[in-house]
Regions:
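Short, conserved catalytic-motif segment at the N-terminal edge
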Residues: 36-95, 118-120, 164-169, 251, ...
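Short, gly/Ser/Thr-rich active-site loops of penicillin-recognizing serine hydrolases
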Residues: 282, 296, 301, 309, ...
């Protein structure tokens, strides 16, 4: 009898231990179950997305709200593409996240290489691109590419050798203003940064960010050129010639570059992006593992460029600019984020401990005003419903570049 009781006690202890271990590891397998609030709280978000679908802005999408501990709310809406018979959007639908590539792949890669002292944020670009030598751009720094203050502008690439065309075209073009004096959002800045990662490491950007970020974070559905084995989960996009694209990057320059580019090309899910956002709100740590240094996170999210308060940029991240619609009216001055042309956006507020992810199957690319309003309204609602902090705070401390 005593032996049986000891065995039962031991078994019970083992079960309790396993349950505790499972509870701590739950986010490793997937974010914790979202707190699906009843009544008016979620009804407001449902109504907002329902209106966007009824007005033809989007076919459907996924909304996810979280904090540094995990997911607070997640919900899928509508269809996964414009096709009338398209499958419904699911929480794990995989979206082309377009320019979010800049902040979840390219900029973190540059900061990680800087903290490893493999490059410096104040390196002249010519150090890594000898093609720029003698072209009047000796003062152009890596920092200028990250903040879109290089003076470079976008241009079409030759189809025969698009990467060579991109680098040579950037090196030879006349700058739009003095270096560092003007904010001009241009994809070419991040195309160069993506190629810089390859030249510094000897690895493709896709390989480097998978090894450094996506795999350690457990972002299993995040990649450039996602595998066809996940084709049934893709949200389709529409190319400029009205072709439906499934698992192929929508951005034409990224397609020319083989689907791997510093400005666009990553595909992801809302839950994978939640992992990345949690890491950033925890100053570079995720589930006890260091992904980026706290200093690198603070550097990326500090204000590096300001034009009379009208444009404030971090390193890759947007803080306050004409592109800041996802900031809404409830996020603080230290919040930051980015948008993607395909209908994606993320916005994070460390002072209020909240982030918002919006991934959509966008239909109307011309109605930018209403789409910006959708992003803004979602963040305003999310802050109102889920954030315990409402007061605004001062701009973050600028740690300065790694040298």
């Amino acid at each position: 009898m005593i032996f049986l009781m000891q065995r039962k006690t031991s078994l019970l202890a083992s079960i309790i231990t396993l349950l505790l271990l499972f509870s701590f590891a739950a986010f490793a397998a997937a974010p914790p179950p979202a707190l699906q609030e009843p009544g008016e709280r979620t009804a407001k978000i449902d109504l907002l997305l329902g209106n966007a679908m009824s007005r033809g802005l989007i076919a459907g999408g996924v909304v996810l709200v979280g904090n540094r501990k995990g997911v607070l709310f997640e919900r899928a809406y509508g269809r996964s593409s414009a096709e009338p018979n398209a499958p419904p959007t699911e929480i794990d639908t995989i979206f082309d996240i377009a320019s979010l590539t800049k902040v979840i792949a390219t900029a973190p890669a540059i900061l990680k290489l800087a903290e490893e002292r493999k490059l410096s944020l104040v390196d002249p670009v010519v150090r890594w691109f000898p093609e720029f030598a003698g072209k009047g751009k000796n003062d152009l720094l890596v920092l200028n590419l990250l903040t879109h203050t290089s003076g470079l502008d976008d241009f079409p690439f030759a189809s025969a050798d698009p990467l060579h065309s991109a680098v040579e075209g950037a090196a030879g073009q006349t700058l739009k203003g003095e270096i560092g004096s003007r904010f001009k959002y241009a994809d070419i800045n991040f195309i160069l940064l993506g190629e810089m990662v390859r030249r510094v490491t000897g690895m493709g950007l896709d390989q480097y960010v998978a090894a450094s970020f996506f795999t350690p974070l457990g972002m299993k559905d995040t990649a450039f050129n996602p595998g066809r084995d996940k084709a049934l989960r893709f949200s389709a996009t529409i190319s400029s010639d009205k072709t439906t694209l499934l698992g192929l990057v929508q951005d034409p320059e990224a397609r020319q570059l083989g689907g791997v580019a510093g400005h666009a090309g990553v595909f992801s899910t809302a839950r994978d992006l939640a992992r990345f956002c949690c890491m950033f709100l925890n100053e570079g740590e995720f589930e006890g593992r260091r992904i980026l240094s706290g200093r690198a996170v603070r550097q990326m999210t500090a204000p590096y460029f300001s034009r009379g308060g009208q444009v404030i940029r971090g390193l890759g991240w947007d803080i306050s600019s004409p592109f800041s619609s996802p900031k809404g009216n409830g996020f603080s001055e230290v919040s930051f984020g980015h948008t993607g042309y395909s209908g994606s956006s993320i916005w994070l507020d460390p002072s209020a401990d909240i982030f918002v992810v919006l991934l959509t199957a966008r239909l109307d690319y011309k109605n930018t005003k209403d789409f910006s309003q959708l992003r803004s309204d979602l963040s305003t609602l999310s802050a109102e419903l889920f954030s315990p902090v409402t007061e605004k705070s001062k701009l973050a401390h600028n740690d300065g570049p790694n040298r």
